[in-house]
């Protein structure tokens, strides 16, 4: 089973940069998007063979998530049941017979860390949500977590120590997710590899120089460990400031 997650930084813009060709080439069983930045009715994607599920932010041109899946889920839930968080369209959960699939667009702490306090509330509530799901079925969660966990997960750790996405607080929260048992699937296969990133600033020719961050993840419940088959970061695929990340799993 092949799963893809991609922060498209605006699906309408990404469509103009070859999204549909990349989608077809990747041929995923489940394809998750973050930061779709659209409202209902603004985008009509013809994707034969896929069921589509979209969650929208209340504001125009902000946040949003989507999931395209070849197999119809048993149920779909939008959000995590907390209005403060759910108004931004950040989470979609698909229930299948043997697992839950959750896609997430974690809030960015923003410049001057003005949203860090809110981010900490989000982290606590979202982890509680995942753990609650896990009580009944294993969980696969993917998306833009807006954090580089370790120094090997970004090009310039020293100069970014107090910047959004690499603060001690954000890293500690992601650490708690892993301490609760979830597996960072890319690091499961590549524990020490450096220079593999999923996001690059549009400034300073960052992508050309590979001055990036690994902030897009697939994490899974520990009981799926023996079913993990592979993980990839598709840095060759353009169309966004992020690239798609992949999980191969037998389910």
Kindly label every feature range from the protein language model.
Residues 81-82, 107-123, 158-163:
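Surface-exposed cleft-lining segments at the edges of enzyme active sites
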Residues 37, 42-109:
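Structured beta-strand-rich core segments of catalytic domains in phosphoester-bond hydrolases
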Residues 1-9, 98-110, 142:
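Active-site-proximal beta-strand elements of phosphoester/diester hydrolases
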Residues 234-251:
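Surface polyanion/phosphate-binding segment centered on an Asp-His-Pro turn
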């Amino acid at each position: 089973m092949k799963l893809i997650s991609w922060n498209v930084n605006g699906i309408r813009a990404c469509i103009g940069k070859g999204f549909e060709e990349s989608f077809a080439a990747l041929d995923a069983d489940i394809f998750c998007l973050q930061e779709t930045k659209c409202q209902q009715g603004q985008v009509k994607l013809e994707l034969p063979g896929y069921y589509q599920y979209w969650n929208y932010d209340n504001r125009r041109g902000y946040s949003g998530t989507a999931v395209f899946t070849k197999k119809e889920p048993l149920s779909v839930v939008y959000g995590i049941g907390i209005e403060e968080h759910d108004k931004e369209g950040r989470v979609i959960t698909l229930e299948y017979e043997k697992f839950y699939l959750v896609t997430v667009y974690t809030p960015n702490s923003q410049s001057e860390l003005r949203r860090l306090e809110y981010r900490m509330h989000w982290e606590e509530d979202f982890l509680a949500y995942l753990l609650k799901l896990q009580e009944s079925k294993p969980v696969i969660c993917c998306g833009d977590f807006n954090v580089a966990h370790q120094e090997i997960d970004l090009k310039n750790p020293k100069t970014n120590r107090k910047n959004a996405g690499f603060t001690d607080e954000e890293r500690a929260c992601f650490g708690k997710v892993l301490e609760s048992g979830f597996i960072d699937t890319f690091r499961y296969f590549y524990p020490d590899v450096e220079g593999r990133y999923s996001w690059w600033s549009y400034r300073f020719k960052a992508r050309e120089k590979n001055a990036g961050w690994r902030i897009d993840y697939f994490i899974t419940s520990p009981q799926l460990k023996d079913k993990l088959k592979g993980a990839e970061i598709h840095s060759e695929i353009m169309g966004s400031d992020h690239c798609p990340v992949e999980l191969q799993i037998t389910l």
